[in-house]
A protein has these predicted regions:
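Histidine/acidic residue-rich metal-binding segments in metalloenzymes
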Residues: 1-83, 101-117
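Short acidic, gly/pro-rich beta-turn/loop elements at beta-sheet edges
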Residues: 49, 98, 131
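Short, flexible loop segments at the rims of nucleotide/cofactor-binding pockets, characterized by
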Residues: 14-16, 90-99
Length: 199
């Protein structure tokens, strides 16, 4: 996987998809009912493979029900966990070229299988998408997909995932002009830390 950059092209996403399916089938989400999990990159693009995954979840039909390493099943149907227990983001599919078109297409595919109520907007800016204009075009392209896609652009889903998000963000201010990250303290005092802007 290291040769020809295959890990970055395919391995990373494949590993995310495998981890997502393993997480659901392990029963961990049943044992920890309040646990919230964020899976990046639409779970490694799991939406494209869901018809195959769903079909093979039926262990009797696939002939693996009597094999211990294959017979463990979660309490709820597989889609329950996909639709109610996991959160996803839409980063990872948009760059460095044609970010808007490719990224928006990936959002369309993801939202065809996963509910917009569980998806967070994200980009790989500045690692993969390097131009501000491409990010703006990406946002516009996602908006063009309709109201379901536009829902992922606000902060409602992030607030479900991260308790007290608005209050936490209000305490953090980045002053790019002077290279200092300021964290406002309880009494209004600030803790200043130099920021290396080259990263």
């Amino acid at each position: 996987m290291n040769a020809n950059d295959l890990w970055r092209m395919l391995g990373w996403e494949f590993s995310l998809m495998v981890a997502t399916v393993r997480l659901i089938n392990s029963g961990l989400l049943d044992e920890l009912p309040s646990l919230k999990i964020h899976v990046s990159h639409f779970g490694g693009g799991i939406a494209r493979y869901l018809p195959r995954i769903r079909g093979l979840q039926d262990r009797e039909k696939s002939g693996t029900a009597q094999i211990p390493r294959h017979s463990r099943m979660p309490r709820e149907p597989f889609d329950h966990y996909l639709q109610h227990r996991l959160f996803y983001d839409c980063a990872g599919w948009s760059g460095p070229d044609y970010a808007a078109e490719r990224g928006a297409e990936w959002v369309r595919v993801g939202l065809a299988e996963l509910p917009s109520s569980q998806v967070l907007f994200a980009t790989d800016y500045p690692q993969a998408v390097r131009q501000d204009e491409e990010v703006i075009a990406y946002v516009k392209a996602v908006c063009g997909l309709g109201s379901g896609a536009r829902k992922i652009l606000d902060d409602a889903n992030a607030q479900k995932l991260i308790p007290n998000l608005k209050e936490r963000l209000a305490r953090v201010q980045l002053h790019a002009g002077n290279g200092v990250l300021q964290l406002a303290g309880e009494q209004g005092a600030a803790i200043s830390t130099p920021v290396d802007e080259s990263q």
